[in-house]
Amino acid sequence: MRARALAMSNDPIAEEAAIAQLGQGGSAVGAVLAGFFAAAGGYSGVLLSPLTILVAGIGTGGRAFDGRLRQPGLGTKRPRGFLPDEAIPAAARIAVPAAVAAAAVANAYDGAKSLGSLVKHGILRAERAGADGRAEVLGRVRSAGQVAFSEQAFTRPFLRLAGPSEGGLVTPSDFANVTDIDHAATTRHVADSDFLEAPWAEAASTEPLPAELGIGAVVCAVDVRGVFAAVAYFRPSDGLEIDDLALLAPYVAVPTQRGIPRQPPGSPLPAPAPIAVRCNADGVPVEVCAEPGARALNFGSPSRLSISRDPVSREVISHRR
């Protein structure tokens, strides 16, 4: 398929929204975020799961926005911790979502559309699925961005199930202190090519995705300005169901164990980021690559999804393998 701008995903819900956003004159960043929010409305587990956003443009280098889950426990003392033979409650494995914070920062960096205009894709999907609680959460995100997650309408049902009273670590302070989001992309030199990727992206791996993250998905886009963007997110099928919000939180946080140093509160928790942007010898981005469902890109073979752009003709071509 040949054009001047394209978007694609292994998730049909996300792909439809991303293509629609580009068709309305949107940017590559807006397209991939629209796809993410559509998925967040269509599936209960996406909004509270990890997100990686990668952006690269001509003459601007690459940026990575860290929407990985954060370890909870800000503003509290270290708990005593669980003993080796002690049952660990599900609440102790619930982490702090940072996807919306990362999306807001990436969208501000792009500056093309308001975040609310992108979130509307998710609201429509949630309403179509009959998930009224999820539609309400996304409605508040549309109005307030990350601040919506510090409002009582969100924190009260979340903390009721994942707070200290249930053996969890999450506190109100966790939702007000999502930091360290914007990073310069790192460069990996492989087979005479430079690939821009997130600093936390893994090297080639044959290991399966962590079971708690469920299905891996990506959205890729290239716009008429020559900006390349990609997001990697997840659709967990198992986790803590927060019925009042129609959301599912995956079991990713690290429980504190007695006698073992605890995971620092507020620190990002590992998550795969199988997306990269390849540059030519002049440092110009020419291809966005993605390997949905994998822990990392396999740089030795063609990616499952890719969009390439000829810097001279500006023609854009997509590939599915």
Segments and roles (model prediction):
Residues 70, 236-238, 293:
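A short acidic/small-residue loop/turn micro-motif
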Residues 41-56, 215-288:
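Active-site rim segments in enzyme catalytic domains, especially the processed small/beta chain
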Residues 151, 155, 168-173, 183-234, ...:
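Internal maturation/activation junctions in enzymes
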Residues 141, 146-147, 197-200, 292, ...:
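Low-complexity, intrinsically disordered tandem-repeat tracts enriched in small residues
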Residues 61-68, 196-199, 231-232, 287-291:
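Short amphipathic beta-strand/extended segments with alternating polar/hydrophobic composition
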Residues 98-106, 133-140, 200, 205, ...:
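Active-site-proximal alpha-helical segments within enzyme catalytic domains
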Residues 174, 180-182, 209-212, 274-321:
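C-terminal catalytic domains of large/alpha subunits in multi-subunit enzymes
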Residues 1-195, 256-259, 266-267, 273, ...:
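Noncatalytic scaffold domains of N-terminal-nucleophile
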